[in-house]
């Protein structure tokens, strides 16, 4: 059975406050039956130097991605992962990670592809937990198999593909959440990160540039609903919004904001993102600070 929502007034203004928990709530419910805590970091070694008691590690690269095909794991693989991590289908899953929950939001988005009903983020993530000097451990919990059922992914509601993006150009909101250097075409990869093989630089025509990190404050918590509404005030209730970055990890954070904190009904994450678009043949690309227009073919 799902655990109760966090009643904190700091969350109540969001469209779906039940998708977030505070550190106080997690501390109070630690060890409760039906609670699964997951750490998913960009730096996959952080879990091993200390983590929230009872938390299991999910490696975004090796656990969530198919080892051969460039795609996510399938239903059988996800069920095996959940069994191995001791997570049941009806558990309340709280995910947290480093860097303002960047990769934690990615893991939550993948859980959503498989229809796990109750999955939440720890507001502020790992960094805030440590800043508040809350309890950590080196102990890795022993988990038993849960009999997690095989449920195949349902990509359509929240995942966009290249042809979906081509179909909405100049008709629906498209948001590029990457760094300014990536958006303008000055570089093909994130600053301070290695080159990943994109052949072209720039952005998709008509894409508005709103870096993902603008949705979080200095502590790593999400900004208030009022601040977020101002940031994304160009999105109308009936819009079909698509967000993208390089492989869908940063845009998962923006997807979470739009879907769960602002209550936008139709938001999809284009996880192929610039790794696909920047290598694709005959797709339109714009360089510079302006969104640009769709070229006439």
Swiss-Prot record:
- What residues bind substrate, as annotated? 250
Catalytic activity of the protein: thiosulfate + hydrogen cyanide = thiocyanate + sulfite + 2 H(+)
Annotated CDD domains: TST_Repeat_1, TST_Repeat_2
Pfam families listed in its UniProt record = Rhodanese
Molecular functions (GO terms) = thiosulfate-cyanide sulfurtransferase activity
The answer on whether this UniProt entry bears the keyword Transferase reads: yes
InterPro entries from the UniProt entry: Rhodanese-like_dom, Rhodanese-like_dom_sf, Thiosulfate_sulfurtransferase, Thiosulphate_STrfase_CS
Q: Does the keyword Repeat apply?
A: yes
Q: Catalytic residues?
A: 245 (cysteine persulfide intermediate)
The record's annotation in SUPFAM superfamilies points to: Rhodanese/Cell cycle control phosphatase (SSF52821)
UniProt keyword list? Repeat, Transferase
Q: Which SMART domains match?
A: RHOD
Q: What is its EC number?
A: 2.8.1.1
Q: What is known of its domains?
A: Contains two rhodanese domains with different primary structures but with near identical secondary structure conformations suggesting a common evolutionary origin. Only the C-terminal rhodanese domain contains the catalytic cysteine residue.
Q: What is this protein called?
A: Putative thiosulfate sulfurtransferase SseA
UniProt source species:
Mycobacterium bovis (strain ATCC BAA-935 / AF2122/97)
